[in-house]
A protein has these predicted regions:
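Amphipathic alpha-helical "output/dimerization" segments
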Residues: 500-520
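Membrane-interfacial segments at transmembrane helix termini in multi-pass membrane proteins
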Residues: 375-408, 516, 524, 531-533
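Short, well-structured alpha-helical segments
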Residues: 96, 304, 412-421, 516, ...
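Ligand-binding loop in jelly-roll beta-barrel domains
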Residues: 478-499, 510
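Alpha-helical transmembrane-bundle signature of multi-pass membrane transport and export proteins
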Residues: 1-389
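Residue-level signature of catalytic and energy-coupling elements of molecular machines
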Residues: 163, 366, 467, 485, ...
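Regulatory nucleotide-sensing modules
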Residues: 398-477, 481-483, 503, 532-533
Length: 533
């Protein structure tokens, strides 16, 4: 996990430093118009490419997708450096900047989908997202600062070279992550069209009510973020009269607030109310913006924008964790690719809408509307957020049973949570048959309480106790039950249906290998502590 966090730090610092260098170069070449055109082109290219690039994270080993993204960016940035030193036409550097943006869209979805496979518990997953959000907050103000210092001392070409080296360092760190069977096996995949692959992320979000809600609230937040990117300039120049330097101070306040938000988000580790935390983060993202219009005092505004930064970190940590725990692993990167694209589009839309609000309502009116939007959106959604928290609570005993199973033990913590939520409690009386030899199998069973006896061709071969499991042979080999399992006394079982069992076990290499090992032992012995069923 440490390697992926360090790689993310190198990537985010390099991205922001490079972005500053491109903006300054564009301004020197063509003024504000060039800056706007280049920025729009980079944003548009990334928004279009993101859902397509995210397919890679679900088809291939996510580590190597991230490495490929880093290497591609390093090559394009090195090309920009060569173009700069060769006095090539500015269009060459602009095109390369667009290619860097496109290449970057594969990195974040693959990273967001890889982290759950490295986290062993829900708490570790939340902690990893806290670290990622903290690193991003640092990168947002440290990256431009580094880029600015290098620009002042050495020029854009050197910034390009340094940021290209940062991408290479990120790639090296990721390449050192040990391979888990998270890597995809292309031979076992069913051939599908690119369109089907592309739409899988959209379909997953559309099908799951909780994911629609989360993505919708994320979109509302980034829409207001886009408006704030315009409004913050007006706040500095008109309301506070701090000049152009004030724009930087106000943006820094948000970044510093994000660091304090990381401390608040650290308290989320282990909490069972992350959807409520997400809603609180959305709420406090908006309210301070409206309050700026009420009392435009410089110190007060800095504090308010720091609160926005706190809300931003809480939203990022809780929202990312909820999505990682909600989406199936096989489409997780594409879900984040869709999210990335939607967020880019809503940020741009917010930036377009803000000038119209300013012309229509004036500065204070625009601030009140922008700040009120998020509370007005999240308050009606509060019952649904609470419902997400209620349904997300998984009894610890179910997770413990899954972790104790040799088949499920290798699975990522987020996948285990999803399986625990899919378990169905089954009770049986003494002498009642759970499965019968020769019948089709459609469930896998974990024993919570009681004792069961296993019969093969009418002969008692084994007894099962709490913590044992049975039923995987019929599911994985698609054969009839190989044994009869009967309750010796009253028993309590947890049943997992075929669809959930196969999706989890066959989609994760270590789990499939463990299952095949168990099957080999069962079919090879039929006795000695392992049941054939």
């Amino acid at each position: 996990m440490r390697r992926i966090e360090l790689a993310w730090a190198a990537s985010i610092l390099g991205t922001w430093a490079y972005g500053i260098a491109v903006v300054v170069y564009a301004y020197d070449q063509g003024g504000a118009t060039a800056v706007g055109v280049v920025g729009l082109a980079r944003w548009f290219a990334a928004a279009i490419a993101s859902p397509f690039a995210a397919i890679l994270g679900d088809r291939y080993d996510r580590r190597w997708v991230m490495v490929g993204s880093d290497l591609a960016r390093a090559v394009f940035i090195a090309g920009a450096a060569l173009a700069f030193f060769a006095d090539a036409p500015p269009i060459a550097i602009y095109v390369l900047a667009g290619l860097v943006s496109v290449a970057s869209t594969a990195f974040r979805p693959a990273e967001a989908a890889l982290i759950p496979s490295l986290a062993r518990t829900p708490e570790e997953l939340t902690a990893a997202n806290v670290a990622a959000s903290t690193i991003e907050s640092v990168g947002i103000f440290a990256g431009p600062a580094i880029g600015g210092l290098l620009l002042a001392g050495a020029g854009a070409g050197v910034v390009f070279l340094v940021t290209g080296a940062a991408m290479l360092w990120s790639a090296l760190l990721i390449a050192g992550i040990p391979p888990s069977a998270e890597a995809k096996d292309q031979d076992d995949r069913e051939a599908v069209s690119v369109l089907d692959e592309l739409l899988a992320g959209f379909r997953t979000i559309a099908r799951e009510r909780r994911m629609r809600l989360l993505v919708g609230l994320f979109s509302a937040q980034t829409f207001v973020d886009g408006m704030l990117s315009v409004l913050i300039v007006v706040i500095a120049l008109k309301l506070l009269d701090t000049g152009q330097a004030g724009v930087g101070f106000l943006n820094s306040a948000i970044g510093i607030g994000g660091l304090f938000g990381a401390l608040a988000a650290a308290a989320l580790v282990g909490r069972k109310r992350q959807a409520a935390d997400f809603g609180i983060g959305i709420f406090i993202w908006g309210v301070p913006i409206a309050l700026v219009a009420v009392w435009p005092n410089q110190v007060f505004v800095l504090v308010l924008l720091a609160v926005v930064g706190i809300g931003n970190t809480i939203v990022d940590v809780s929202g990312m964790t909820l999505l990682q725990r909600s989406a199936p692993d096989e489409v997780l990167a594409r879900v984040f690719g869709v999210l990335e694209s939607v967020l880019l589009l809503t940020v741009g839309l917010g930036a377009i809408v803000a000038p119209f609000l300013l012309n229509w309502l004036g500065t204070r009116g625009a601030l009140i509307v922008a700040g009120s939007l998020l509370p007005l959106v999240v308050i009606p959604a509060w019952p649904r957020l609470n419902a997400i928290d209620r349904t997300a609570e998984v009894p610890v005993e179910r997770l413990d049973l899954l972790r104790a199973s040799p088949i499920f033990a290798p699975l990522p913590g987020a996948t285990l949570e999803q399986l625990a939520g899919a378990l169905e409690e089954v009770r049986a009386r003494a002498e009642e048959e759970i499965v019968r030899q020769g019948e089709p199998g459609d469930r896998f069973y974990l024993i919570k309480d009681g004792t069961l006896d296993v019969y093969v061709d009418g002969e008692l071969v084994q007894s099962l106790e709490p913590g044992d499991s049975f039923g995987e042979i019929a599911l994985l080999r698609d054969v009839p039950r190989t044994a009869t399992v009967k309750a010796r006394n009253e028993v309590v079982l947890y049943a997992l249906d075929r669809r959930h069992f196969l999706a989890a076990v066959t989609g994760f290499g270590p789990s499939l290998s463990a299952a095949e090992g168990v099957i080999g032992m069962r079919l090879g012995t039929g006795r000695g502590g392992i049941v054939r069923a």
